[in-house]
């Protein structure tokens, strides 16, 4: 988590520096040769994962108001008074982690964390906090309220998962029966009207002809996801053979999706563990019988879940990093 602290007084600056000593981040003082409030808020709202104001809540609210979008993208915002008595999360308490951050900041300076979200106030399972702890994307943030409201009303919520979840489920959270509708689902392949939580564990293996354009890769990727019902947000990285390390179309495709891309030699790919879809043609060109599956496995350190799909000179395969979810949803 990248953090940015802003203070307004000498006393506040001393507290911000103390907090940053324990929870590192940039520290600025508004005015006195430092940044202006509006400029600082605009820059840090776009850059940082968390903004920490040491000052009045009203100042922080006015500073961030022009930049707030929605709970899926807004950073965590926490305000502490300059004496360090209270730590108040005011934005992105669950998905952004502001509630947990407020507790952590409070522990550093002896403040009282002032947590106002209903699930936390009532000691009820917060599905969006759980998703963040399990490194999952929330596909439909608007459906969070439905799950939380049901738990707050005392009713059970039902879930489905493609992965075994360690530990005991929180109170009120029960597995959905075969014929029952799930309220939320831990899945790579969303379907229906449940709240879908997507583990960010996928690595996309890529093979392509020389000169393949970004547009061709995008079209093939859309077909790949549609054919399998795959949530593309599960993918966090890509991999291919080193022969493609300077392909402009492939590099731009990965950059546009925000994926780091790892390239491997034919010898490295040949030593990838597992069974792969062989191609004599691919071997004749690259020196190894399969690029996309082998590259995905090496980069993920896991196994193939979607084998090679080929079309229009592009091949994709998906491997998963090891993933062991549990029912932890609060920081210890």
Name each model feature, range by range.
Residues 12-18, 34-36, 44-46, 50, ...:
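Conserved mixed alpha/beta catalytic, RNA-binding, or beta-rich assembly cores of soluble enzyme
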Residues 25-35:
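A short beta-strand-loop structural module common to alpha/beta enzyme folds
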Residues 237, 241-296, 300-304, 308-314:
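C-terminal non-catalytic interaction/assembly regions of soluble proteins
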